[in-house]
């Protein structure tokens, strides 16, 4: 499914939208000097219109994004259009010709005239529109003088061409993540330097890539966070952000890059986080400020960059060898979420001399200890405050995983939001979901899109998870089936684009159904065994872009007896709104403990292999237990639990239900 865009004609109602209230978007109409009746009418909430309309009308001053099919289905409803037309008619009848919106005591024609007479505000198209509108309104007294163009004898530095220290030729089986891992470079560097797109969709066999500098790597998993990564790497959050410029200053977008390899140590970066200048490249004088420079950028600048279509702040910083933090400092008018870059305008991308000498530059001061009578040691600390999602009422606050429901407009949303399905893919039971989320109802248990729920407490227990539903998706339109799929397929699943394609392969998928890639290709002849993964995800750009594929022509494979062994792997997603098979991690589940387990007289139940002989305290594994839950319950550390139970793996995927583990010596 290809990305879809909204035609400009879709904004024909923009004037109406801006004069009323969409849920979640508010405007102080009472401050505009309008009549009481007009204000009351304008203050009407149109509940039938989606918040997507407010976002696309730019009511939140954010970025207008490209929409995909589910967004369009939510946006383009007959009820919304009818209600907007009705409100427009009511506004026209309630608000008189004296109800003129005068913001900040400036009449609109007058402010427009002043703008057109300024060399900084004049534009031929705006001038034509102004003349046309004042003429149609029979407004007089607004004749303007075309200003003399304001010019400098300089132009902005053209977009730089990346200098490649190394190159790489793409193979048929490559992904952005595999290239990054093999060459010891960050995934984002590979993606941004070569304009491959967030989902790596522009990666083509035979293409020559420019590789970024090497560094020590770590792959982001769904269980990571910035604090844990910097602790493990013995570094700091400012350094981590400096080495990985796609991370925002608060590091709150860390989990947007699950599956990416990031730098946790980089020799070519200074400890403070700024890009270390290559010898001889430190600028000592500023270049002339270009005529198209952003007004709020530093004028004491050694290099300017003109924003091109598709650019983002992180892309610009990587291409110009500057950290994202420094880019924001040199261009203070840019929002920290980079939603207000102006196309065709120039931004400063290189300081003059040492950027730390600029007034107002935030300098990181090392931790300091000093003594004064009486002796007192003070140590500076670094605090990271991350935004928190809205949790369901009463939901446990110590869970290891949270999730929310899919949008109602999605195919099979009711099934995929059901507690039985959520429990199944997370390796827990419905009873546990109800226990961890008291707001959920046993009779109609389903996750809401607006709230986050606890879906896992520690690691899942190694036991089969009952699920009486089906993995088969309900296809609404046969046109969604890829041509060439076998005609007798009676069970479909689907995959999504975006980050999902970075860590999902055909091998991951078939491992769930106990057959090989060859059989998957037989079910879907439009795939080939040699390029199965690439063909499965072809043209899937974003996380809301998905494709159906056949997983069985003999019924739901979930309810068929496994042919090869008792062990089955259920792949899970970090958030429920991703496609069913989009796998950053997996939970291994077994039907029973191995028959070789032994029992002793002391423990209250059979023990797992590897328990120490001097154990004095035991815990019998119950449904819902995981390593985190066990060592937290007994006030011990994870290291102690693994030391006393040497055969338990670090990911706790092999503890056995009903067996005793040592929790004290």
Curated annotation (Swiss-Prot):
Signal peptide: 1-19
Superkingdom to which the source organism belongs: Eukaryota
Annotated spans, Disordered: 585-610
A molecular function (GO) term: chitin binding
LysM domain boundaries: 166-211, 216-264, 303-349, 409-454, 617-663
Xref: PROSITE patterns: LYSM
Inducers of expression: Expressed constitutively with no significant difference during colonization of banana roots.
Bias kind Low complexity: ranges: 592-602
Role description: Might have a role in sequestration of chitin oligosaccharides (breakdown products of fungal cell walls that are released during invasion and act as triggers of host immunity) to dampen host defense.
Family stated for the protein in its record: Belongs to the secreted LysM effector family.
Protein name from the UniProt record: Secreted LysM effector Lys3
Organism of this sequence: Pochonia chlamydosporia (strain 123)
Native organism taxonomy: Eukaryota, Fungi, Dikarya, Ascomycota, Pezizomycotina
